[in-house]
Curated annotation (Swiss-Prot):
Source species taxonomy: Bacteria, Pseudomonadati, Pseudomonadota, Gammaproteobacteria, Enterobacterales
Gene3D superfamilies: 3.30.390.30, FAD/NAD(P)-binding domain
Name of encoding gene: sthA
Subcellular compartments: Cytoplasm
UniProt similarity note: Belongs to the class-I pyridine nucleotide-disulfide oxidoreductase family.
An annotated GO cellular component: cytosol
Protein name as annotated: Soluble pyridine nucleotide transhydrogenase
Single GO term (MF): identical protein binding
Obligatory cofactor(s): FAD
Binding locations of FAD: 36-45
Protein species of origin: Escherichia coli (strain K12)
Coiled coil ranges: none
């Protein structure tokens, strides 16, 4: 006789991965509950990560644009805004996102339960509710989509009022004049752009020898130059020895012997999976040192009825990919296998000022693979649309095979890069000979547009062939 469960599946977490899984499951007729420990749905992406940081970035970039445009500014009075004012803008966006996502669950009759979940046995969860009560829930299958949080080394006092991580920085109430950012990954670089755009002095401490080493080197170099040109001080190959919080700021002692002092510190070096409170040992699951779970191609863990998606499984740790992972896991959970799969070349968007976006291979990868490629470039300053809107800083680079003309990689630095990249991605994904750089020469673009950069870059690249 089959066992009776409260739900067909329980999804732990309502971020992009959890939402993708939950929507995929209810569309297939499953009885689903989503457990969210926070008071609102959306997960870290909506409340502490992607959405607020991008809303901050947008507000700051518009201030920069206003102050640099002689049409609006006589340069005797610069437009300024406090960090608190800009955070209010982010809060408005977060509230809109929360209401919208809450509506998704309600329309699809997907139950939302608030509290902290922990496994009791292979098919049972205990839910610690906000009122102190404990509920017991059973399900045939589970999707763990509990996300990640900033990594906290034990020797750094994050209770100090001037030491922040990428979550707590969003509740900063003072106006710093000088910020130390430890960790020059995506989050560190994005916040370096935001603070420098607000005319705050920034020291960016990088534990490696260059910024964002996974990028094409020209894109990484462009960001380094832009930071340097705007006044960000980058310190490569440095690690902290000791971090001291004091009344008027923070002092960082580096292993190289240097000492740095600033009004506050943003520690942005690594993230940890939110798995420590799930009691995974009760179902025989183990995480790695970063609290992450290993999964197979269908996002199953070592327990076949337990799936995991999003930040909790590590790479690529993108909201866009997490949603698709959830959707694929939902298909595998119901049907036993998934026909859908993540695309091979996942686009990357980095919301510095200016933006960086890429898809496909870098020049360094193609050179190492001994692929005969050529490069086509378009400088934004040569595009009519960029001249009209004052977006002269930027470039689009297309890497393509010299013989087959197949597009192998696209890299963009400049405002709207994360949007521009998708035009090229759409052609790269074409099968049966559809992926060719000649498409951009043979098609007609609206004029004037930023998309025209593809035609300019394609002509530039094809003219190099002989």
């Amino acid at each position: 006789m089959p066992h009776s469960y409260d739900y067909d599946a329980i999804v732990i977490g309502s971020g992009p991965g959890g939402e993708g899984a939950a929507m995929g499951l209810v569309k297939q007729g499953a009885r689903v509950a989503v457990i969210e420990r926070y008071q609102n749905v959306g997960g870290g992406c909506t409340h502490w990560g992607t959405i607020p940081s991008k809303a901050l970035r947008h507000a700051v970039s518009r201030i920069i644009e206003f102050n640099q445009n002689p049409l609006y500014s006589d340069h005797s009075r610069l437009l300024r805004s406090s960090f608190a004012d800009i955070l209010n803008h982010a809060d408005n966006v977060i509230n809109q996102q929360t209401r919208m996502r809450q509506g998704f669950y309600e329309r699809n009759h997907c139950e939302i339960l608030q509290g902290n979940a922990r496994f009791v046995d292979e098919h049972t969860l205990a839910l610690d509710c906000p009122d102190g009560s404990v509920e017991t829930l059973t399900a045939e299958k589970f999707v763990i989509a509990c996300g990640s949080r900033p990594y906290h080394p034990t020797d750094v006092d994050f209770t100090h009022p001037r030491i922040y991580d990428s979550d707590s920085i969003l509740s900063m109430h003072h106006e710093p004049r000088h910020v130390l950012i430890y960790g020059a990954g995506v989050i560190g670089c994005e916040y370096a752009s935001i603070f420098r755009g607000m005319d705050v002095k920034v020291d960016l401490i990088n534990t490696r020898d260059r910024l964002l080493a996974f990028l094409d080197q020209e894109m990484s170099d462009s960001l380094s130059y832009h930071f340097w040109n705007s006044g960000v001080v980058i310190r490569h190959n440095e690690e902290y020895e000791k971090i001291e919080g004091c009344d008027d700021g923070v002092i960082m002692h580096l292993k190289s012997g240097k000492k740095l002092k600033a009004d506050c510190l943003l520690y942005a070096n690594g993230r940890t999976g939110n798995t420590d409170s799930l009691a995974l040992q009760n179902i025989g699951l183990e995480t790695d040192s970063r609290g992450q779970l290993k999964v197979n191609s269908m996002y199953q863990t070592a327990q076949p009825h337990v799936y995991a998606v999003g930040d909790v499984i590590g790479y690529p740790s993108l909201a866009s990919a997490a949603y698709d992972q959830g959707r694929i896991a939902a298909q595998a959970l119901v049907k036993g296998e998934a026909t859908a799969h993540l695309i091979e070349d996942i686009p990357t968007g980095i919301y510095t000022i200016p933006e960086i976006s890429s898809v496909g291979k870098t020049e360094q990868q193609l050179t190492a693979m001994k692929v005969p490629y050529e490069v086509g470039r378009a400088q934004f300053k040569h595009l009519a649309r960029a001249q009209i809107v004052g977006m002269n800083v930027g470039t689009l680079k297309i890497l393509f095979h010299r013989e087959t003309k197949e597009i192998l990689g696209i890299h963009c630095f400049g405002e709207r890069a994360a949007e521009i990249i998708h035009i090229g991605q759409a052609i790269m994904e074409q099968k049966g000979g559809g992926n060719t750089i000649e498409y951009f020469v043979n098609t007609t673009f609206n004029y004037p547009t930023m998309a025209e950069a593809y035609r300019v870059a394609a002509l530039n690249g094809l003219n190099r062939l002989f």
